[in-house]
UniProtKB/Swiss-Prot annotation:
It comes from the Bacteria. Belongs to the Rv1128c/1148c/1588c/1702c/1945/3466 family. It holds the Pfam family DUF222. This is Putative uncharacterized protein Rv0095c.
């Protein structure tokens, strides 16, 4: 599914936030050991999917945004906005490259 508008993108992020909030509020006490393992497996699969969207956004910023728009280099902008170290920002930027 491709988002066709800014509003649709906002809706997708809002829904993801809401679902993660719900996940934070549940108790896993009702699950059996196999169900807990399956739940961990599902969380791992979800966590591995997130970088794909991050890579797309980082690459778009790298190719389409000026340092003036970013307030500095891409690594500095990522570090500041994401509240991560500059080396971590550099690692993410390098990892995102096709």
């Amino acid at each position: 599914m491709l988002a066709n508008s800014r509003e649709e993108l906002v809706e997708v992020f809002d829904a993801l936030d809401a679902d993660l909030d719900r996940l934070d509020e549940v108790s896993f006490e009702v699950l059996s050991t196999p169900e807990r393992l399956r739940s961990l497996e599902r969380l791992e699969c979800l966590a591995r999917r997130l970088p794909a969207a991050q890579h797309t956004l980082i690459n778009q910023l790298d190719t389409q945004a000026s340092e003036e728009e970013l307030g500095g280099t891409l690594c500095c902008a990522l570090a500041n906005r994401l509240r991560i170290t500059k080396p971590e920002a550099g690692r993410r930027s390098a990892e995102a490259k096709p």
